[in-house]
A protein has these predicted regions:
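N-terminal export/targeting leaders of redox proteins
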Residues: 1-24, 105
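Stable alpha-helical elements in mature extracytoplasmic
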Residues: 26, 63, 67, 93-97
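Sequence/structural segment immediately N-terminal to covalent heme-attachment motifs in c-type
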Residues: 24-41
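Axial heme c-ligation environment in periplasmic c-type cytochrome domains
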Residues: 37, 46-57, 70-99, 104
Length: 105
């Protein structure tokens, strides 16, 4: 019985690791975290297009840290009346996403 439980736990751990590793690119990470349900790279959907976010924050030294907080905690009032909810991402994932967003042209 202990071997069955141990094997089940190992399988679960492997599945979790595989799903985390599945997002090999920032765009895949954005898709897996459902960012693309409200955002697109070039067109406004519910939220702003990522290229517009990059243009707005271009040259701002604190842009990455500011946007990481918005991604993690949510926010409102910057892009219109629809608030962005907080997102279930790690600090590292938020930084990866924001660096990718700020690189859009």
């Amino acid at each position: 019985m202990k071997q069955v439980v141990a094997a089940s736990l190992l399988s679960l751990a492997a599945a979790v690791a595989a799903s985390a590793a599945h997002a090999a690119t920032p765009e895949e990470l954005a898709k897996s975290k459902n960012c693309m349900a409200c955002h697109a790279t070039a067109t406004k959907l519910v939220g702003p297009a990522y290229k517009d976010v990059a243009a707005k924050y271009k040259g701002q030294k604190d842009a990455e840290d500011k946007l990481v907080q918005k991604v993690m905690k949510g926010g409102a009032g910057v892009w219109g009346p629809v608030p962005m909810p907080p997102n279930a991402v790690s600090d590292a994932e938020a930084h990866t996403l924001v660096k990718w967003i700020l690189a859009q042209k």
